[in-house]
Amino acid sequence: MSVIKKIILLNLFIILFSATQIVAGNLNILFKNLQNAQNIHEAEKLEKKIWDDWTKHPNSKYLTNKLENATYSMNHQQYQIALKLFTDIINEDPKWAEAWNKRATLYFLIGNYDDSLKDIEQVLNIEPRHFGALSGRAQIYLSYKQYEKAVDDLQQAKTIYPLIKSAKSIEVIKKIIKDLQI
């Protein structure tokens, strides 16, 4: 390989690595601010910014566009198309948490909870602060009547995002657990 090609490749690597670091740094700031949000309006604005970051691939506009197309298909009940697109994205970049999360959502929508849980595990391995994945897994645990696990996930989501709306159901679920023990 020529010296010029090596320099070009090195520069591309540096640019891509830098973009990834900027996104990670931005997310860290957003999560810190989310934990300290004083009201729901402020928290929801931060939540939207986090989702915006999660749904944008750090290095590939192509993958971002593909995720948008897959999400559109999912939202319009074109589930087979969406599944293929989400799976293609995961195969192209298995370290992009949001691709796994979107496919987990699709599996949830079509009632395939076991595969949804598997994808949620991947999401949380990549991005442990993914309050959306935690809330989604809690919904699945509720459908399986695994109430303690649902509470654990909702409490974990609340630790990350203290004003998250899904945390309001924690006390209701705890009451269900208590009633079942009687």
Where are these regions (language model features)?
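Terminal, low-structured helical/coil segments at or just beyond the last alpha-helical repeat
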Residues: 29, 56, 152-182
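Residue-level recognition of tetratricopeptide repeat
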Residues: 96, 130, 147, 163-164
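Residue register within tetratricopeptide repeats
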Residues: 41-44, 80, 114, 148
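Alpha-helical adaptor scaffolds
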Residues: 60-126
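Register position in tetratricopeptide repeats
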Residues: 75, 109, 143-144, 176-180
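Canonical tetratricopeptide repeat
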Residues: 102, 136, 169-170
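TPR alpha-solenoid repeat register
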Residues: 99, 133, 166-167
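N-terminal leader/linker segments that initiate helical-solenoid repeat arrays
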Residues: 20-68
